Design a protein with these regions (language model features):
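Sec-dependent N-terminal signal peptides
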Residues: 4-13
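Short, surface-exposed ligand- or partner-binding patches at beta-edge/loop junctions that are enriched
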Residues: 86
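Rhodanese-like catalytic fold shared by cysteine-dependent sulfurtransferases
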Residues: 15-39, 47-82, 91-144
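Active-site flanking residues adjacent to catalytic metal/cofactor-binding acidic residues
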Residues: 42
Length: 144
């Protein structure tokens, strides 16, 4: 029994180890100065948690609450699209990123939690509607 628990803990650790973290300062730089690639920004908090979201005039996130809504909608995104995910504190973002990686996505980043975000924000009414998914949240710098 202990061996099974140890194996399960190690498997979870390996899964999280495959998720690439994205430093929030780097995300702030992308929002302020443009990114070198198109990306989709996803907030996996529930609608009840949203008082504001990461974003600005050039970058509008999607809100796909983890797990049900995220699992139902996120697979509409092309598997080679860059996806950046965040939540309140980072845990759900890690789970959502691991889900995408497990489903063959190759450019997935965990930007951690909104609680530590000090960059630009938007109101919930400015969040990108799901009907536009998989349109990027932000286009690469110099790309229209």
């Amino acid at each position: 029994m202990r061996l099974k628990i140890l194996i399960a803990v190690m498997a979870v650790g390996l899964c999280y180890g495959a998720v690439t973290p994205l430093n929030q300062d780097k995300l702030k730089d992308y929002l302020a100065n443009g990114a070198p690639f198109d990306f989709i920004l996803i907030d996996v908090r529930t609608s009840q948690e949203l008082t504001s979201a990461i974003g600005n005039a050039a970058c509008k996130p999607y809100n796909l609450a983890w797990p049900d809504q995220f699992k139902a909608e996120a697979l509409k995104i092309p598997k080679d699209q860059t996806v950046i995910i965040y939540c309140r504190s980072g845990g759900r973002a890690a789970n959502a990123a691991a889900f995408l990686i497990d489903n063959g996505y190759t450019n997935v980043y965990n930007a951690g939690g909104f609680m530590t975000w000090t960059g630009s924000t938007i109101t919930p009414s400015e969040i990108k509607p799901l009907s536009l998914l998989p349109a990027p949240s932000m286009r690469a710098a110099g790309k229209k």
